[in-house]
From Swiss-Prot:
Organism listed in the record: Haemophilus influenzae (strain 86-028NP)
EC number, as in UniProt: 5.1.1.3
Leading EC class: isomerase
Coiled-coil intervals, chain numbering: none
UniProt protein name: Glutamate racemase
Gene designation: murI
Disulphide-bridged cysteine pairs: none
Length: 269
């Protein structure tokens, strides 16, 4: 590819590395675009934070990165953050802001038993907008909700090279293990597609796993493809975090596997 070709710059933002599940679908669909990824590990997990804190930290990180790399779009690759930060971000930026919404509508269309599980963070499952999605698209279904921080931590450990603790995973999902007609699972946190295979081992009755990542990638393409983008970008893909962490050196060695050249710590407090 000619380096002088205009490439959109897209920032993916999450409190952890769960947003990799969205980024990898975008990279698969649009391999030559310029990607930045920021995970706010100093504020992790967002499911334990107040809404005002999530808004402040997300805005601060996005504005700081935008000053250095003029952005063409921001993807909030975090369901918990997407429930609160989209309006303030859209007020602060004149570029597309793309959120992550649990795939309840497609789940209601594909389920055969009309019994759906929504697996998300504690912050997401209690949001009013989840009630609205269910009322609008899944009134004829039984929708079980399970809010968990443990699965987020398990996914974080997996992406950092650790083995998945299946015993802990099974224990966390045990309340659903006996639901024989639970045939559809909405992965309502971007971390969970990263441990989908392990979840399936624990819930073998589930036939359909609903992950919005591919749809988000198509949305990015729709909003930015063939647009008159003014920046001629020759930058390499870069990752940011907000605090140093124990596995940092090992993590950096694996960056190229995800298509990134470097990891930089930024301060947003």
């Amino acid at each position: 590819m000619d380096k002088k070709e205009k490439r959109p710059t897209v920032l993916f933002f999450d409190s952890g590395v769960g947003g990799f599940s969205v980024y990898r679908e975008a990279k698969k669909l649009l391999p030559n675009w310029h990607y930045l990824y920021c995970f706010d590990n100093a504020g992790f997990p967002y499911s334990e934070r107040e809404e005002e804190s999530i808004i402040h930290r997300t805005l601060a990180a996005c504005q700081l990165i935008n000053q250095r790399y003029p952005l063409d779009a921001i993807v909030i690759a975090c369901n918990t953050a997407s429930t609160v930060v989209l309006p303030p971000l859209r007020a602060a930026f004149e570029i597309p802001i793309i959120g992550t919404v649990p795939a309840i509508k497609p789940a209601s269309e594909i389920t055969k038993t009309k019994h759906i599980g929504l697996l998300a963070t504690k912050g997401t499952v209690k949001r009013h907008y989840i009630d609205e999605l269910i009322d609008k698209f899944a009134q004829d279904c039984i929708v079980e909700r399970l809010g968990t921080t443990k699965l987020v931590e398990i996914a974080e450990q997996k992406i950092r090279g650790h083995s998945v603790d299946l015993i802990s995973l099974k224990d966390e999902l045990s309340s659903w293990a006996g639901m024989a007609d639970l045939d559809t699972l909405v992965l309502g946190c971007t971390h969970f597609p990263l441990i989908k295979d392990e979840i399936q081992l624990c819930l073998p009755q589930v036939k359909y796993f609903m992950d919005p990542s591919a749809a988000i990638a198509k949305r990015i393409k729709y909003l930015l493809d063939d647009k008159n983008l003014q920046v001629q970008n020759e930058k390499y893909n870069q990752m940011f975090c907000t605090a140093h962490f124990p596995e940092e050196s090992q993590f950096k060695k694996a960056l190229h596997l995800w298509g990134f050249e470097s990891l930089e710590v930024i301060k947003i407090d």
